[in-house]
Every structure is written in C-alpha cells, then in structure tokens.
Amino acid sequence: MESEDYLDLKAVATLTIVTLLWGFNYVAIKYSNQGVSPIFASTLRSVIASICGLFYCLKQEEKLFHTDVMLFHGVMVGLLFGAEFACIYLGLLYTDAARSVLFIYLSPFVVAIGAHFFLKGDRLTVPKMVGLVLAFTGIFVVFSGRPKTAKATMFLGDILQITAGVLWGATTLYIKKFMAKRVEPIHTFLYQLFFSIPILLIVSIILEPRWIYKMDPYIIASLLYQSIVIAFITYLVWFKLIHKYSVSRLSAFTFFTPIFGVLFGILLLHEALTVSLMMGLPMVSMGIFLVNWRKRGIAI
C-alpha cells in the first residue's frame, strides 16, 4: 500500500493528541520515579504494554511472532529500544524533564544523517543541513544556561538523554532498513516492547538494589499512563500512521512534543524557566521542522 502524500484533518488531529500525550509522559515518569526505581518502572511498562499487544494480536487473529529473519530483526529493535529507555529513566533522576525532552528529540537529526548513508532516496538537503545546524545551536544554548535547580549531576543526566536520542534514531533507521513494509505495525510495536523486557530487567537487577519504596494512587496512575496510554495506545497509533502516511510529514509534527513537554514540566513540576531554555527550545523545534521540510512544504 502506497503512503498518502498529505496529512488529512484526521491525521493532524491524531498527531496533535499523540504529541501532547508524549510531552506529558516526562512528567508522568517524574512522578513514578518518586516511588518506583526508574528502570524497573520501564520494565513494568514494557510488560504491561506487551500483554496489551498480545491480546490485540489474538483479537485481530494476527500471528504473535515471525519464524524467519524478521524475528531476529525484532530482537535487535527490542534491544535498542530497551537501552534507549534505560537511558531516559536514569537520566530523569539527574536532569529536568524540560531539558530531557529537548535532548531526546535529537533523534530526528540522527535519522536524517543515518538515512543519507544507509537508506536509498533519503538524502541530506539544504533545509535538512540548516535544520541540523540550527538544532545543535539550540542545544548549545540550552547547555550554556544554568537553572536554579542545577546540580553537579545534571550534566550526567543530559548525556544520558542525548544517548537515548541517538538510540531512538538508530532504532528508527533499523526499522526503516530491515522491517518497513515487511511486517504489520502491531508486530513492530510488539517486538520493540517484548524484547526490551530482558535488557531492562537485567540492567535493573544490576543497578537498582530496591525496586519499590513507595506506592500511592498518583504513582500507580503514572505507571498505568506510561504503560497503557503511551507504550500501547500511542505507539500503536504512531506505527499505523507511519503505515498509511508519508513518514517525512509525520515526523515534522513531532517537534510539538518538546514544546508540550517543557510546558508540562514548568506548569506541573515547577521546574525552572530560564532564558537559555526558552531560547534553545524554539531553535531545536525549528531545526526538527526544517530537517523534515520538503520543497512543496507540509501539505495539510
């Protein structure tokens, strides 16, 4: 099935809701970190979302796992995905949610550079190069600021979030290279979540001596939100959108996520609002937009 070369109103509305939910997810992770160790929380998220995915496959009468080389690729995607979220959850222990969102969304730049070398027909263009320069300038601006909540360990958290962004980009490239149009969206989703469980659990056992040290309704709600709303519903919706619409046009819309994430971090977590952060945010967002820009623009 060929991809539609435009985003209709339904796609635009869906993308807006998805990016809003993704932005709020960083606040949800901050809440769950108050009572559940971060990597174990990520493991729980993958377990719960995988169970939801298994039931979905059974209901839709889809095969659960492939028996050919696609299974190997599924394992690789799961390992990359697991390493990415280990970095995200650990990084949020040391840095602000607002900064985390910015660094995670370096991923589209990793994809743009990687696609130039590894994917046919997806070359670096002038708008993409301008976007890369603008985005990394924005990252420099953010690093130059020191919010009132700054700690000596914040740099470690920032590095972990940047690593997560690189891993996210690598996962996307791997899927495009080896799995796109060869498996159904539900299988890409299921492989990512299911095969991330072992690596997350192993890392949690090694690094986290205690998994649960506090539990209340807010923490439980946070974990359920991350597992069902984010990991199951929005990821599955995202893969279905990729299956139907132009990927470059879809990707352009993800620059709304850091905006929502920063706003939620400031409004709900009372995180510091700095000049450098507010200067860097639109630069990073515009950079992401330019990386995904086409000569005809974004048709809606």
Task: Please provide the spans of the model-predicted regions.
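Helix-helix packing/entry segments at the starts of transmembrane helices
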Residues: 44, 100-106, 174-197, 227-267
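C-terminal-most transmembrane helix of multi-pass membrane proteins
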Residues: 2-4, 13, 44-49, 54-58, ...
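Transmembrane alpha-helical segments that form core, pore/gating elements
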Residues: 53, 111-112, 149-208
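Specific alpha-helical transmembrane segments that line the substrate/conduction pathway
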Residues: 40-51, 80, 89-127, 132, ...
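Specific transmembrane alpha-helical segments of multi-pass solute transporters/efflux pumps
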Residues: 21, 25-26, 54-104, 140-141, ...
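Glycine-/small-residue-enriched transmembrane alpha-helix faces in small-molecule transporters
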Residues: 1-40, 79, 83, 87, ...
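Juxtamembrane helix-entry segments on the extracytoplasmic side of multipass membrane proteins
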Residues: 7-11, 34-39, 43, 65-72, ...
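Hydrophobic transmembrane alpha-helices of multi-pass small-molecule transport proteins
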Residues: 53, 75, 106, 113-114, ...
